[in-house]
Swiss-Prot record:
Protein role: Substrate-recognition component of the SCF (SKP1-CUL1-F-box protein)-type E3 ubiquitin ligase complex.
Signal peptide from the UniProt entry: none
Official protein name in the record: F-box only protein 36
Subunit-level organization: Directly interacts with SKP1 and CUL1.
UniProt-listed Pfam families: F-box-like
CDD domains named in the record: F-box_FBXO36
Keyword annotations of the record: Ubl conjugation pathway
F-box domain location: 91-137
Gene3D superfamilies reported for this sequence: 1.20.1280.50
């Protein structure tokens, strides 16, 4: 399974805590941690300061409390915990699957489970709210999808259409049809 992993497992950039304006990058690869920093200052003594870089193996990072503190100060303890997990070989394989495959899997979940999954990460939030997923859900729950339904879904989105009850859906479809008929009469 580790062969599925890309070379770069995680990357984050950020600014140091106030009053610092320094810029930082943390890059986790399959074999090492790379911590980079750029000194940002208006003071003349820092104008010629070169960017810095520290490279450590995963094992060395787990023993380097100084670098761990720097990561926690700049990026927070949640990021530090995540980096610990990556260094210990605890990878989030599910998150790394292709969107297409994840959408196929998510289609089989109950609506409550989809709602819960959407709260786990920004990637799953995007997928769980995507029109592609909700179009598949609507297709699996409806016998037929009419052209009017497709047109309505194009305007309001498949998720919103699914969540709208049948009476409202029929009313909106009728209003759209009336508007189209009125426009056709005006053009004639």
């Amino acid at each position: 399974m580790a062969s599925w992993l890309p070379e770069t497992l995680f990357e984050i950039v950020g600014q140091g805590p106030a009053p610092s304006k320094d810029y930082y990058q943390l890059l986790i690869t399959r074999t090492q941690i790379i911590f980079r920093w750029w000194k940002i200052s208006l003071r003349s003594e820092y104008r010629s300061a070169k960017p810095g870089e520290t490279k450590e193996s995963h094992e060395d990072f787990l023993d380097n409390s100084h670098l761990q503190v720097q990561v926690a100060v700049v990026f927070g303890t949640k990021i530090l915990d995540y980096v610990f997990n990556l260094c210990e070989g605890k990878f989030d394989y599910l998150e790394r699957l292709s969107d297409r495959l994840l959408l196929k899997i998510i289609c089989y979940l109950d609506l409550e489970d989809i709602a819960s999954l959407s709260q786990t990460s920004s990637k799953f939030e995007k997928l769980c709210k995507s029109d592609l997923l909700w179009e598949q859900i609507v297709q699996s729950t409806c016998d037929t999808i009419t052209p009017d339904m497709r047109a309505l879904a194009k305007n309001m989105g498949w998720r919103q259409m699914f969540l709208t009850n049948n009476i409202q859906l029929q009313r909106q479809t009728r209003k759209k049809k009336q508007r189209q008929e009125n426009q056709a009469e005006k053009l004639a």
